[in-house]
Amino acid sequence: MSSVAVLTQESFAEHRSGLVPQQIKVATLNSEEESDPPTYKDAFPPLPEKAACLESAQEPAGAWGNKIRPIKASVITQVFHVPLEERKYKDMNQFGEGEQAKICLEIMQRTGAHLELSLAKDQGLSIMVSGKLDAVMKARKDIVARLQTQASATVAIPKEHHRFVIGKNGEKLQDLELKTATKIQIPRPDDPSNQIKITGTKEGIEKARHEVLLISAEQDKRAVERLEVEKAFHPFIAGPYNRLVGEIMQETGTRINIPPPSVNRTEIVFTGEKEQLAQAVARIKKIYEEKKKKTTTIAVEVKKSQHKYVIGPKGNSLQEILERTGVSVEIPPSDSISETVILRGEPEKLGQALTEVYAKANSFTVSSVAAPSWLHRFIIGKKGQNLAKITQQMPKVHIEFTEGEDKITLEGPTEDVNVAQEQIEGMVKDLINRMDYVEINIDHKFHRHLIGKSGANINRIKDQYKVSVRIPPDSEKSNLIRIEGDPQGVQQAKRELLELASRMENERTKDLIIEQRFHRTIIGQKGERIREIRDKFPEVIINFPDPAQKSDIVQLRGPKNEVEKCTKYMQKMVADLVENSYSISVPIFKQFHKNIIGKGGANIKKIREESNTKIDLPAENSNSETIIITGKRANCEAARSRILSIQKDLANIAEVEVSIPAKLHNSLIGTKGRLIRSIMEECGGVHIHFPVEGSGSDTVVIRGPSSDVEKAKKQLLHLAEEKQTKSFTVDIRAKPEYHKFLIGKGGGKIRKVRDSTGARVIFPAAEDKDQDLITIIGKEDAVREAQKELEALIQNLDNVVEDSMLVDPKHHRHFVIRRGQVLREIAEEYGGVMVSFPRSGTQSDKVTLKGAKDCVEAAKKRIQEIIEDLEAQVTLECAIPQKFHRSVMGPKGSRIQQITRDFSVQIKFPDREENAVHSTEPVVQENGDEAGEGREAKDCDPGSPRRCDIIIISGRKEKCEAAKEALEALVPVTIEVEVPFDLHRYVIGQKGSGIRKMMDEFEVNIHVPAPELQSDIIAITGLAANLDRAKAGLLERVKELQAEQEDRALRSFKLSVTVDPKYHPKIIGRKGAVITQIRLEHDVNIQFPDKDDGNQPQDQITITGYEKNTEAARDAILRIVGELEQMVSEDVPLDHRVHARIIGARGKAIRKIMDEFKVDIRFPQSGAPDPNCVTVTGLPENVEEAIDHILNLEEEYLADVVDSEALQVYMKPPAHEEAKAPSRGFVVRDAPWTASSSEKAPDMSSSEEFPSFGAQVAPKTLPWGPKR
């Protein structure tokens, strides 16, 4: 099919250099000189009158018919045959079995082709493949590779032909492999081999080999030749618009590559078949030799700026000179400073060419007009209207304004440029006479104050003095402000701006000292709090120091009064922060932490809220007992008193106040609290609280069990007395492993030293860095005596001795079981003494001890005690029903572990039996035995305890009996509590959380009856000591639930209010803000009707809560409705180009306007029919004020938008092209649409103009079309 393109003159000129001579006619540059346009019939030849395709179906007639291709079927079928000798899988009894079937299935799934297999009489395999062409070819390749035995062969072709076998991106090779169903391996480029390996069937190999050799043979016919030709003669060989070289290429079929003028290469490359290539080379050589003899050169000087006019757009002018005169014009490169242009050609034609070169050079000129850069936008005019007058008269002149330069550049035909220059110079002169500008320096930090809130100050100055004020953006940090306009207005604006700046320079700067730790809190998360302060004091600049500087100075700058107000505000804020950051630590016994937290955190939450403090408790798995309270000092003290009172109520905790002079407190506490900690640990972990340093109080509070408090009081007073009389301290060192031995069992040894000398000995705590240091405090003589005793003990410990003792082998196992637990305990207690028992299996009774002499003796004594216990060991049975065993053991066996430690006994529980109930069935005789034979009598006695109930206790008799009593005391007891059935589910709580919490808190088991029983009785099982507390807790919970039920009944009061659905969104508010506030304020639930529910009244809003609260909420909603009914909505046309600026970043600006005027402003969505329509809703007077305000903003912003758009047009770089008259496009004559109206309209009744259809013609067989 032919195609018709509509070309403008510009695009025609751009493309003609690439067309062959037969396709174009020579055209001149000016459209006026063009030949007559072609007729419509020439441009669009009519189709043949009679379609020959019906008469001659096999040979369609006409140029259009030649292009028709038969439609190919989308699904094809191919059949492949695999001979018996080439089959991979021959040994098959039946088709469809084994590996062959699997392979076919895989091929079908992967390729999407359909396979059908059949066996011929000669046992050859026929495969029919159906599907799309690609799928069939891929399936065929897979079938050959996997069902047919593979052979291989090699073919050698020249290495340089390999790339033609591969083809572009390997496409040729892939295609070849698919066609021949083979695998072709070509050596890598770095491999010198020229052998190509082909793998596949014999038939496929032959085909592939043939194709490869054909490709190689085809390449053998072709040749490449390079011809060196001087660069200067390339234009003659190429010819004007590359026509000459195009002709040679077309006639010889040879490809000729001439390097472009920009590439500094001289060789011309020829590619083609050898004979034609030789002809092409001969013709080029002939042209080169001829031109070399006949041509000569002349050099002329042409201004560098005019070179581009000689070259012309895309080199067209050079081609035009070459075409007209046969002379080549050589222009120096653009980066060269040379202005010499060389003309090369036959002598008689050089004159004409030189004339044309000068004509082209002088056809355009460049001129400049001096104009201050600040006047440029006034010269351009509003929306570019001033310049439009000049450019409309002289469209070929290009006017360029360069930002920052005091000149305007004009470029175009000389006459037009001169006229335009005169006009622009007149405009500049007029503007200079009428206008003035001034530049003033004002510190950039004052610029935003000069601009004012939303540009209020600067806009007032602009309107008042009719001037333009240019303030640089903050990012430039420039101090220069430029004022342009009427000379008088400029001076007045300058005076006012300088006065404002002067006033600001006289502003006060104040340094505020705020501890750096509070800076982050004052700034707030993402700067929220500091933003609030800045909004409160907008005229004050607040600068915080860089965190890396570690500075406490915060700088405030602004008007004196505002700075003072801001200072007071921030000082008050800091005072509140300091006051609220007071912190105290309260030591509370760990077992009472859960009581202080209370049920669901109720107690701790109540204390926090009422005291307005932050209370941090240690983690449950932490060993710390300290609770930290943070807040105001008075509040912290109140919270501490409440927490301590809870502890006091819960246990037998005594509290004693001791008066000790404040000056002794630090010495009593000791370094890092070591001294006071040693007293607290020694006296059963009592809590000793000293008053805050600097308070002047002498009162020290001791809190804990009564006996321990008295003991601690005595020690504290004794220590204080010592400190007051004379305090002396000595440090001695001993290995950490000796410390336990020096302290002795239960602190016996160290107590003996203290009692005998009167000195206090302090050992390091586990967290202390120096673990060797032991401190002795007291009177000098007592300290010296204690030091002497301890050093003697340490010296003895340093003297290592080895001793042995005899231990009956039957007892050895007791010492080494559980990975030598008993031996480890002995080593820890007796200064790291090493005890070695003989290896198991040997009958030796000798045990070796190695360590300090005293330690060895003490260890021997301890081993002897253990042996005596073992020999005096008895076994007692304690019968406790198996169902109570888990309760007796306690969490993770903690209760049993405590009993074994307290009474030094071993306790063994029986194995658990699945059937824990007594069997009522008679005992079955086994092997004819009587019921009692071979069994203990007690097993058969129904009254005796079961084996699974018996707990074995081993140890000394008296200790076993005491342990038995302790175990029996752990057997849980059950009591019943009456709780109304309807409260049971609330007692259980969500997913059992309530009942589980109560069980954990009181360490009991609570059994709630099944719902179907409708019983009011709840059973509590646990230790007798815990039952009373659990019962009281349960009854307390019942009281709470009953109170909640009553409260729920009161809260369920419902009230309906009728409100028009159109007001619902306003009542709900943005993101539900309004309705949420009403809900929270009145503590009610407000339900709006469901829009999708047609049965529900859409104007009913339901309020649920206390009766008084629902009525208050109803009144609040009706107030909003009343306000909304008074509101009006008005549409205002607002240019869409300024919408974004009015809305502001993230809607900040529009929100400010809406808040200021108390209106709602809605902008059109993208794609709206009227993009300029903005809706304002609110009270009538507010709507009017808001509309006036946004229309003022529109006028101000629109001026900037228009100026910016106009400037953009003239700030673009010039297109260095010849100016042309407006294009006429593609023109034809005698087109149907140009027929004169006088022509007669077609006669619809005429049979000639509208012939009737003849009789139906019998259809003829066509080469393609629908199936018959």
UniProtKB/Swiss-Prot annotation:
Instruction: Give the subcellular location.
Output: Cytoplasm; Nucleus
**SUPFAM superfamilies from the entry?**
Eukaryotic type KH-domain (KH-domain type I) (SSF54791)
- Where is the sequence biased in composition, kind Polar residues? 1234-1249
Classification via CDD domains: KH-I_Vigilin_rpt1, KH-I_Vigilin_rpt10, KH-I_Vigilin_rpt11, KH-I_Vigilin_rpt12, KH-I_Vigilin_rpt13, KH-I_Vigilin_rpt14, KH-I_Vigilin_rpt15, KH-I_Vigilin_rpt2
Classify the main location. Answer: cytoplasm
Q: Where is this region: Disordered?
A: 914-944, 1233-1268
- As stated in the Swiss-Prot or TrEMBL entry, residues carrying the post-translational modification Phosphotyrosine are 437
Coiled-coil stretches, from where to where?
none
- Phosphoserine: which positions carry it? 11, 31, 35, 317, 645, 1247, 1252
Q: Which UniProt keywords are listed?
A: Acetylation, Cholesterol metabolism, Cytoplasm, HDL, Lipid metabolism, Lipid transport, Nucleus, Phosphoprotein, Repeat, RNA-binding, Steroid metabolism, Sterol metabolism, Transport
Q: Any idea which residues bear N6-acetyllysine here?
A: 991
Cross-referenced PROSITE patterns, in alphabetical order?
Answer: KH_TYPE_1 (PS50084)
Q: Pfam families, from UniProt?
A: KH_1, KH_Vigilin
Q: Which domain of life is it from?
A: Eukaryota
| Bias-annotated ranges (Basic and acidic residues) | 932-944
Q: Which GO terms describe its biological process?
A: cholesterol metabolic process; lipid transport
Family matches, as PANTHER family:
SCP160, VIGILIN
- In Swiss-Prot or TrEMBL terms, this protein is called Vigilin
Q: What is the lineage of its organism?
A: Eukaryota, Metazoa, Chordata, Craniata, Vertebrata
Gene this chain is encoded by: HDLBP
